[in-house]
Protein backbone atom coordinates (compact mmCIF):
# COMPACT_ATOMS: atom_id res chain seq x y z
CA UNK A 1 0.00 0.00 0.00
CA UNK A 2 1.41 3.36 -0.98
CA UNK A 3 1.79 6.11 1.58
CA UNK A 4 -0.90 8.77 1.20
CA UNK A 5 0.64 12.01 0.10
CA UNK A 6 -0.77 14.05 3.00
CA UNK A 7 0.96 12.46 5.98
CA UNK A 8 3.84 11.13 3.92
CA UNK A 9 4.60 14.73 3.06
CA UNK A 10 4.59 15.68 6.74
CA UNK A 11 7.04 12.88 7.55
CA UNK A 12 9.22 14.02 4.67
CA UNK A 13 9.16 17.60 5.93
CA UNK A 14 9.99 16.53 9.47
CA UNK A 15 12.89 14.43 8.24
CA UNK A 16 14.22 17.12 5.94
CA UNK A 17 14.01 19.79 8.65
CA UNK A 18 15.89 17.65 11.14
CA UNK A 19 18.63 16.75 8.73
CA UNK A 20 19.05 20.36 7.61
CA UNK A 21 19.67 21.27 11.26
CA UNK A 22 22.66 19.00 11.46
CA UNK A 23 24.55 21.03 8.91
CA UNK A 24 27.03 19.45 6.52
CA UNK A 25 27.82 16.42 8.67
CA UNK A 26 24.63 14.40 8.72
CA UNK A 27 23.41 11.05 7.53
CA UNK A 28 19.84 10.08 6.71
CA UNK A 29 19.27 6.36 6.71
CA UNK A 30 15.97 5.56 5.04
CA UNK A 31 14.54 2.12 5.58
CA UNK A 32 11.02 3.14 4.70
CA UNK A 33 8.20 0.62 5.01
CA UNK A 34 5.54 0.89 2.32
CA UNK A 35 2.60 0.46 4.72
CA UNK A 36 3.80 2.65 7.56
CA UNK A 37 1.60 5.71 7.09
CA UNK A 38 -2.10 5.72 7.90
CA UNK A 39 -4.38 6.31 4.94
CA UNK A 40 -6.10 9.29 6.53
CA UNK A 41 -6.39 13.00 6.01
CA UNK A 42 -7.41 13.67 9.60
CA UNK A 43 -5.08 15.67 11.90
CA UNK A 44 -2.19 13.55 13.10
CA UNK A 45 -0.37 13.18 16.38
CA UNK A 46 3.43 13.09 16.52
CA UNK A 47 5.09 11.83 19.69
CA UNK A 48 8.61 12.89 20.70
CA UNK A 49 10.81 11.61 23.52
CA UNK A 50 14.34 12.97 23.78
CA UNK A 51 17.25 11.75 25.83
CA UNK A 52 16.81 14.76 28.10
CA UNK A 53 15.28 18.19 27.89
CA UNK A 54 18.05 19.49 30.15
CA UNK A 55 20.05 20.35 27.04
CA UNK A 56 19.31 23.34 24.83
CA UNK A 57 20.20 21.27 21.78
CA UNK A 58 17.08 19.13 22.15
CA UNK A 59 14.81 22.02 23.02
CA UNK A 60 15.79 23.72 19.75
CA UNK A 61 15.24 20.47 17.84
CA UNK A 62 11.78 20.22 19.37
CA UNK A 63 10.95 23.83 18.50
CA UNK A 64 11.75 23.19 14.84
CA UNK A 65 9.65 20.02 14.79
CA UNK A 66 6.80 21.88 16.47
CA UNK A 67 6.83 24.55 13.76
CA UNK A 68 6.43 21.98 10.99
CA UNK A 69 3.76 20.02 12.84
CA UNK A 70 1.70 23.15 13.58
CA UNK A 71 1.99 24.33 9.98
CA UNK A 72 0.15 21.17 8.96
CA UNK A 73 -2.51 21.44 11.66
CA UNK A 74 -1.19 18.46 13.58
CA UNK A 75 -0.33 17.84 17.24
CA UNK A 76 3.07 17.28 18.86
CA UNK A 77 3.36 15.49 22.21
CA UNK A 78 6.80 16.06 23.74
CA UNK A 79 8.10 14.03 26.69
CA UNK A 80 11.33 14.10 28.70
CA UNK A 81 12.74 10.82 30.10
CA UNK A 82 15.48 12.70 31.99
CA UNK A 83 18.18 10.20 30.96
CA UNK A 84 16.16 7.24 32.26
CA UNK A 85 15.80 4.24 29.93
CA UNK A 86 12.91 2.98 32.06
CA UNK A 87 11.08 6.31 31.71
CA UNK A 88 11.71 6.45 27.98
CA UNK A 89 10.23 2.99 27.53
CA UNK A 90 7.18 4.06 29.53
CA UNK A 91 6.87 7.20 27.43
CA UNK A 92 7.02 5.30 24.14
CA UNK A 93 4.32 2.95 25.42
CA UNK A 94 2.25 5.96 26.52
CA UNK A 95 2.61 7.55 23.08
CA UNK A 96 1.49 4.32 21.44
CA UNK A 97 -1.51 4.27 23.77
CA UNK A 98 -2.26 7.81 22.58
CA UNK A 99 -2.33 6.39 19.05
CA UNK A 100 0.37 8.65 17.66
CA UNK A 101 0.97 8.44 13.94
CA UNK A 102 4.75 8.84 14.16
CA UNK A 103 7.49 8.84 16.79
CA UNK A 104 10.60 11.02 17.09
CA UNK A 105 13.13 9.46 19.47
CA UNK A 106 16.54 10.37 20.78
CA UNK A 107 17.41 7.10 22.53
CA UNK A 108 18.79 7.12 26.06
CA UNK A 109 20.50 3.79 25.40
CA UNK A 110 21.98 2.38 22.19
CA UNK A 111 20.62 -1.14 22.74
CA UNK A 112 17.87 -0.68 25.33
CA UNK A 113 14.86 -0.05 23.07
CA UNK A 114 15.04 -3.17 20.91
CA UNK A 115 11.91 -4.97 22.12
CA UNK A 116 9.80 -1.83 22.21
CA UNK A 117 10.90 -0.66 18.76
CA UNK A 118 9.86 -4.05 17.44
CA UNK A 119 6.38 -3.50 18.90
CA UNK A 120 6.21 -0.02 17.35
CA UNK A 121 7.30 -1.45 14.01
CA UNK A 122 4.56 -4.08 14.10
CA UNK A 123 2.02 -1.34 14.76
CA UNK A 124 3.15 0.36 11.53
CA UNK A 125 4.18 3.55 13.33
CA UNK A 126 7.05 5.39 11.60
CA UNK A 127 10.05 6.04 13.83
CA UNK A 128 12.51 8.89 13.27
CA UNK A 129 15.71 8.55 15.30
CA UNK A 130 17.48 11.85 15.98
CA UNK A 131 21.08 12.69 16.98
CA UNK A 132 22.16 9.26 18.26
CA UNK A 133 21.50 5.86 16.72
CA UNK A 134 19.93 2.65 17.94
CA UNK A 135 21.47 -0.74 17.28
CA UNK A 136 18.25 -2.18 15.85
CA UNK A 137 18.02 0.05 12.80
CA UNK A 138 15.73 -2.32 10.91
CA UNK A 139 12.81 -1.08 13.01
CA UNK A 140 13.54 2.56 12.17
CA UNK A 141 12.13 4.56 9.25
CA UNK A 142 14.72 7.36 9.33
CA UNK A 143 17.91 8.00 11.28
CA UNK A 144 19.15 11.59 11.33
CA UNK A 145 22.55 11.83 12.95
CA UNK A 146 25.63 13.96 12.49
CA UNK A 147 29.07 12.45 11.94
CA UNK A 148 29.78 11.96 15.63
CA UNK A 149 33.03 10.11 15.03
CA UNK A 150 34.40 12.98 12.96
CA UNK A 151 33.39 15.47 15.65
CA UNK A 152 35.77 13.70 18.01
CA UNK A 153 38.46 13.63 15.33
CA UNK A 154 38.16 17.39 14.85
CA UNK A 155 38.57 18.02 18.57
CA UNK A 156 41.71 15.89 18.63
CA UNK A 157 43.18 17.59 15.58
CA UNK A 158 42.60 21.01 17.07
CA UNK A 159 44.22 19.95 20.33
CA UNK A 160 47.25 18.57 18.49
CA UNK A 161 47.79 21.89 16.73
CA UNK A 162 47.82 23.69 20.08
CA UNK A 163 49.72 21.22 22.26
CA UNK A 164 52.60 18.91 21.37
CA UNK A 165 51.88 16.75 24.41
CA UNK A 166 49.03 16.46 26.89
CA UNK A 167 47.55 14.54 29.78
CA UNK A 168 43.88 14.14 28.95
CA UNK A 169 40.70 13.65 30.96
CA UNK A 170 37.66 12.20 29.17
CA UNK A 171 34.08 13.00 30.16
CA UNK A 172 32.00 10.40 28.36
CA UNK A 173 28.59 8.78 28.01
CA UNK A 174 29.31 5.30 26.75
CA UNK A 175 25.76 3.91 26.61
CA UNK A 176 24.75 6.28 23.79
CA UNK A 177 26.05 5.69 20.29
CA UNK A 178 26.78 9.37 19.67
CA UNK A 179 28.71 9.72 22.91
CA UNK A 180 30.69 6.57 22.23
CA UNK A 181 31.60 7.60 18.68
CA UNK A 182 32.68 11.11 19.66
CA UNK A 183 35.14 9.84 22.23
CA UNK A 184 36.30 7.03 19.94
CA UNK A 185 37.03 9.49 17.14
CA UNK A 186 39.11 11.55 19.54
CA UNK A 187 41.01 8.57 20.92
CA UNK A 188 41.66 6.97 17.54
CA UNK A 189 43.21 10.22 16.32
CA UNK A 190 45.73 10.44 19.17
CA UNK A 191 46.31 6.71 19.55
CA UNK A 192 49.53 6.48 17.55
CA UNK A 193 51.18 9.43 19.32
CA UNK A 194 52.59 8.60 22.77
CA UNK A 195 52.77 12.30 23.65
CA UNK A 196 49.03 12.31 24.26
CA UNK A 197 47.88 10.23 27.21
CA UNK A 198 44.40 9.61 28.58
CA UNK A 199 44.85 9.58 32.35
CA UNK A 200 41.20 9.50 33.47
CA UNK A 201 37.78 8.48 32.14
CA UNK A 202 34.57 9.55 33.82
CA UNK A 203 30.97 8.75 32.91
CA UNK A 204 28.80 11.86 33.15
CA UNK A 205 25.70 11.12 31.01
CA UNK A 206 26.44 14.31 29.10
CA UNK A 207 24.94 16.33 31.95
CA UNK A 208 26.38 19.49 33.50
CA UNK A 209 25.18 18.58 36.98
CA UNK A 210 26.90 15.18 36.76
CA UNK A 211 30.08 16.36 35.05
CA UNK A 212 30.76 19.16 37.52
CA UNK A 213 31.06 17.03 40.70
CA UNK A 214 32.93 14.31 38.81
CA UNK A 215 35.45 16.89 37.63
CA UNK A 216 35.61 18.44 41.10
CA UNK A 217 36.41 15.04 42.60
CA UNK A 218 39.14 14.42 40.04
CA UNK A 219 40.69 17.84 40.68
CA UNK A 220 40.97 16.95 44.36
CA UNK A 221 43.11 13.94 43.41
CA UNK A 222 45.85 16.42 42.53
CA UNK A 223 46.86 14.81 39.24
CA UNK A 224 48.45 16.90 36.51
CA UNK A 225 46.34 17.30 33.37
CA UNK A 226 46.12 19.63 30.39
CA UNK A 227 42.97 18.76 28.44
CA UNK A 228 39.38 17.84 29.21
CA UNK A 229 37.65 16.22 26.24
CA UNK A 230 33.88 16.23 26.73
CA UNK A 231 31.29 14.35 24.72
CA UNK A 232 29.06 17.44 24.51
CA UNK A 233 28.76 21.07 25.55
CA UNK A 234 26.76 20.56 28.77
CA UNK A 235 29.46 18.27 30.15
CA UNK A 236 32.08 20.80 29.06
CA UNK A 237 30.18 23.48 30.97
CA UNK A 238 30.25 21.27 34.04
CA UNK A 239 33.98 20.70 33.69
CA UNK A 240 34.65 24.42 33.28
CA UNK A 241 32.51 25.25 36.32
CA UNK A 242 34.61 22.89 38.44
CA UNK A 243 37.85 24.26 37.02
CA UNK A 244 36.74 27.84 37.58
CA UNK A 245 35.72 27.12 41.18
CA UNK A 246 39.26 25.87 41.79
CA UNK A 247 40.96 28.73 39.90
CA UNK A 248 42.26 26.26 37.33
CA UNK A 249 40.49 27.31 34.15
CA UNK A 250 43.42 29.31 32.79
CA UNK A 251 45.83 27.08 30.93
CA UNK A 252 43.41 24.16 30.59
CA UNK A 253 41.98 23.12 27.23
CA UNK A 254 38.33 22.10 27.42
CA UNK A 255 36.64 20.63 24.33
CA UNK A 256 32.93 20.12 23.71
CA UNK A 257 30.60 19.11 20.89
CA UNK A 258 27.24 20.64 19.86
CA UNK A 259 28.08 24.29 19.20
CA UNK A 260 25.52 25.62 21.66
CA UNK A 261 25.34 29.42 22.04
CA UNK A 262 26.77 29.17 25.56
CA UNK A 263 29.75 27.13 24.39
CA UNK A 264 30.43 29.45 21.45
CA UNK A 265 30.46 32.37 23.85
CA UNK A 266 32.97 30.56 26.07
CA UNK A 267 35.20 29.92 23.06
CA UNK A 268 35.03 33.58 22.04
CA UNK A 269 35.98 34.61 25.58
CA UNK A 270 38.96 32.25 25.54
CA UNK A 271 37.59 30.12 28.37
CA UNK A 272 37.01 27.05 26.20
CA UNK A 273 39.34 25.58 23.58
CA UNK A 274 36.69 24.66 21.01
CA UNK A 275 33.27 23.19 20.35
CA UNK A 276 32.43 21.25 17.22
CA UNK A 277 29.16 22.70 15.95
CA UNK A 278 25.98 20.85 15.13
CA UNK A 279 22.81 22.63 14.10
CA UNK A 280 19.77 21.60 16.16
CA UNK A 281 17.54 23.74 13.95
CA UNK A 282 18.47 21.54 11.03
CA UNK A 283 17.85 18.38 13.03
CA UNK A 284 14.41 19.68 13.92
CA UNK A 285 13.50 20.76 10.41
CA UNK A 286 14.45 17.41 8.92
CA UNK A 287 12.54 15.44 11.53
CA UNK A 288 9.60 17.71 10.97
Identify the residue ranges that each predicted region occupies.
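Hydrophobic membrane-insertion alpha-helices, especially the h-region
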Residues: 10-25
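Extracytoplasmic "Venus flytrap"
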Residues: 45-64, 68, 72, 77-89, ...
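An alpha-beta-alpha
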Residues: 65, 153-196, 200-201
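Structural motif
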Residues: 77-99, 201-222, 236-237
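Hydrophobic alpha-helical
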Residues: 107-121, 186, 205-265
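Flexible loop/hinge segments that line or gate small-molecule binding clefts
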Residues: 110-150, 161, 260-268, 272-273
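Hydrophobic alpha-helical segments within soluble ligand-binding/sensing domains
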Residues: 144-166, 210-212, 260-263, 279-288
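Flexible loop/turn connectors
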Residues: 248-288
Amino acid sequence: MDKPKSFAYIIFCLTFCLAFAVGSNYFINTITQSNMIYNSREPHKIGATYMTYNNTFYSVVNEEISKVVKEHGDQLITLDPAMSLKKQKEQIQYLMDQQVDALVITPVDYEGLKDLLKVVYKKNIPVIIVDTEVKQNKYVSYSIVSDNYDAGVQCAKDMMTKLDHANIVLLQHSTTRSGYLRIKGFEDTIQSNPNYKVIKRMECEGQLEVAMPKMESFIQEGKDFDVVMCLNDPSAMGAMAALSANNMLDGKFVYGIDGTPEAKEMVEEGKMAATVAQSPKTFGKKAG
